[in-house]
Amino acid sequence: MLNNAMSVVILAAGKGTRMYSDLPKVLHTLAGKAMVQHVIDAANELGAAHVHLVYGHGGDLLKQALKDDNLNWVLQAEQLGTGHAMQQAAPFFADDEDILMLYGDVPLISVETLQRLRDAKPQGGIGLLTVKLDDPTGYGRITRENGKVTGIVEHKDATDEQRQIQEINTGILIANGADMKRWLAKLTNNNAQGEYYITDIIALAYQEGREIVAVHPQRLSEVEGVNNRLQLSRLERVYQSEQAEKLLLAGVMLRDPARFYLRGTLTHGRDVEIDTNVIIEGNVTLGHRVKIGTGCVIKNSVIGDDCEISPYTVVEDVNLAAACTIGPFARLRPGAELLEGAHVGNFVEMKKARLGKGSKAGHLTYLGDAEIGDNVNIGAGTITCNYDGANKFKTIIGDDVFVGSDTQLVAPVTVGKGATIAAGTTVTRNVGENALAISRVPQTQKEGWRRPVKKK
């Protein structure tokens, strides 16, 4: 159906006392992203013309963390209830737009459910998201008459009969801007809490003969709020289980779905295998037949076809061409690039360095600010000395170079194609093509020498 223009209000003013944290509750993360950012993203994906964020506690921290240009910051200086929060945002509502009300601590609400709610909203009425619970204690009850929604009664204000109702209010609703402003102006705080309840607009709408349509979410987790870290951890597990299920159904082999963590977006090819306790962060692309070993962390990287990343390897902001092998216990830092068939072994660290086709750095090596050609062998214990305490310098190694173990390359330095660096060499000057570079202290030998003995 054709929808009106729509703006979203996100309530995010609560202190989050039960989190026992200096951080505003809505900035605590789920899947590596602030809870409120999940809600903002849903609003934007839904096509919100404006997103009004009602804040109070920790406003400076919120503004530092949330940089969305579509946000309109609305201060709620006193926390006097949900209705009061909406009253602060009301001056920004256009009469001819719909207003959708969301919560910064309800992070798993889906765009699909919100779109169904938006589509179901009757002309001049209210769309309301509700669920039925076996134990509705503490929640506002949905009252009905002949099947039609007539109002919402908060638990503390409900009669014994009303407390038997299992259908409860999730707090998420949508209504026309002009209607919303009119109803908000009529709210009172004549209740047990002494607060202004947004839920009272349901009864006001019913009294005007307006229709209220209730919609149910696809999953209960979509409307579960977070008040403490235990609830947050449970929603994290729900979210991760859902992501793992999607990946399994799409053909990714997760060896243990309960021990897989997605904190971003994963794009993948066919026949990908991911072992236990792997963390995917940011935007990650895995090609066909990629294998990732246990305990790896992959962040904002592109991994080519047929690559294998062995256990406990950390990869961040990296590009790997096809058929590369990494690890175990390797660290590829931002700017590392491996061309086809390159190999980085255990305890090798790379940063802002390119390793050419078929080149190998097998173990115990640091490669920083380096450009390494094809078919190069980097021996164990090799270090590119790229930093003088103030500036970084580059090391360039041509194709077919052999670098012996325990070599230090003091940048800036260039090693020509086909050169050989003898083990234990400190390279301080450029090395020509096909040359042998060797710098060692002459070996001496003392016959019959005895080691010192400790005195007893």
Swiss-Prot record:
Q: Which UniProt keywords apply?
A: Acyltransferase, Cell shape, Cell wall biogenesis/degradation, Cytoplasm, Magnesium, Metal-binding, Multifunctional enzyme, Nucleotidyltransferase, Peptidoglycan synthesis, Repeat, Transferase
Q: Where is this region: N-acetyltransferase?
A: 251-456
Its annotated pathway reads:
Nucleotide-sugar biosynthesis; UDP-N-acetyl-alpha-D-glucosamine biosynthesis; N-acetyl-alpha-D-glucosamine 1-phosphate from alpha-D-glucosamine 6-phosphate (route II): step 2/2; Nucleotide-sugar biosynthesis; UDP-N-acetyl-alpha-D-glucosamine biosynthesis; UDP-N-acetyl-alpha-D-glucosamine from N-acetyl-alpha-D-glucosamine 1-phosphate: step 1/1; Bacterial outer membrane biogenesis; LPS lipid A biosynthesis
Please provide the Gene Ontology terms (biological process) for this protein.
cell morphogenesis; cell wall organization; lipid A biosynthetic process; peptidoglycan biosynthetic process; regulation of cell shape; UDP-N-acetylglucosamine biosynthetic process
Cofactor descriptive note: Binds 1 Mg(2+) ion per subunit.
- Annotated acetyl-CoA binding sites: A380, N386, Y387, S405, A423, R440
Q: Which cysteines are joined by disulfide bonds?
A: none
InterPro entries documented for this protein = Bifunctional_GlmU, GlmU-like, GlmU_C_LbH, Hexapep, Hexapep_transf_CS, MobA-like_NTP_Trfase, Nucleotide-diphossugar_trans, Trimer_LpxA-like_sf
Q: Where is this region: Pyrophosphorylase?
A: 1-229
Region annotation (Linker) maps to 230-250
| Taxonomy, superkingdom | Bacteria
What does the function comment of this entry state? Catalyzes the last two sequential reactions in the de novo biosynthetic pathway for UDP-N-acetylglucosamine (UDP-GlcNAc). The C-terminal domain catalyzes the transfer of acetyl group from acetyl coenzyme A to glucosamine-1-phosphate (GlcN-1-P) to produce N-acetylglucosamine-1-phosphate (GlcNAc-1-P), which is converted into UDP-GlcNAc by the transfer of uridine 5-monophosphate (from uridine 5-triphosphate), a reaction catalyzed by the N-terminal domain.
The similarity annotation says: In the N-terminal section; belongs to the N-acetylglucosamine-1-phosphate uridyltransferase family. In the C-terminal section; belongs to the transferase hexapeptide repeat family.
HAMAP family assigned to the protein according to its UniProt record, in alphabetical order: GlmU
Protein known as = Bifunctional protein GlmU
> From which source organism is this entry?
Shigella boydii serotype 18 (strain CDC 3083-94 / BS512)
Q: Which gene encodes it?
A: glmU
